[in-house]
Amino acid sequence: VLGGPWQSADEIDFDALPEQFVLKCNHDCGGMVLCADKSRLDISAARTKLNWSLQKNYFWASREWPYKNIKPCIFAEQYMVDTNSSASTAQGLIDYKFYCFHGEPKFFYLGFANMVNGVKRDQLSFKNLDWTPAEFYRKDHEPFPFTLKKPRNWERMVEIAKILSAGIPFVRVDLFCINEQIYFSELTF
């Protein structure tokens, strides 16, 4: 973590942040600002987006119980670029999202946010743990337009998902593999 927690985006000292960073909320989906070049960042728009995100609570919207009593805040993280990915790194990072039942990952999807004409378009591909395509998909998201190779440390990623989901009836474990290093993203219940 580079900075925070902040209770309001107005508390953030952008001058103290590095040239590249990510600002995100601890309690929602999509409430983040990716900054690849601070000199081009619209600070006012970033503050507006983050302050709006702080007002959301997924418990009231969709009854996701982990969000009910969380105190919303903003924090800064390192901006990451995968120079080893078989996907175009100019388009973003690949998310590995494991669906785990009682400590056992059963399948996963590869998540990817692609920018098309300035509009973010999420794409995802469901796979079995052996990397064969799953027999199901989400019709509200397009599958990947390219093929990815299994990361070299794939077995370790599966093991981490098992460890993090142990003793939990259901949880989605999200990981990144960036430059052959595994990073934890989040748990979704």
Model-assigned labels for residue ranges:
Residues V1-R40, A45, W52, K56-W65:
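A conserved helix-loop-beta module that forms one wall/lid of the active-site cleft
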Residues G4-D10, Y79-T83, F176:
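Short, solvent-exposed loop/turn elements at beta->coil junctions and helix N-caps
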Residues D13-F14, Q20, K97-Y99, L175-F176:
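Short acidic loop-to-beta-strand element that houses the catalytic metal-binding Asp/Glu
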Residues L17, A46-K139:
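Phosphate-binding site of ATP-dependent enzymes
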Residues F21, C100, Q181-F189:
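A short beta-strand motif that forms the metal-chelation/ATP-contact edge
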Residues N26, Y79-M80, Y99, F176, ...:
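Anionic group-transfer/hydrolysis microenvironments
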Residues D37-K38, C100-E104, I178-E180:
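Short acidic-glycine loop/turn motifs at beta-strand connectors
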Residues N69-I74, N84, Q123-Y183:
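A long amphipathic alpha-helix within ATP-dependent nucleotide-binding catalytic cores
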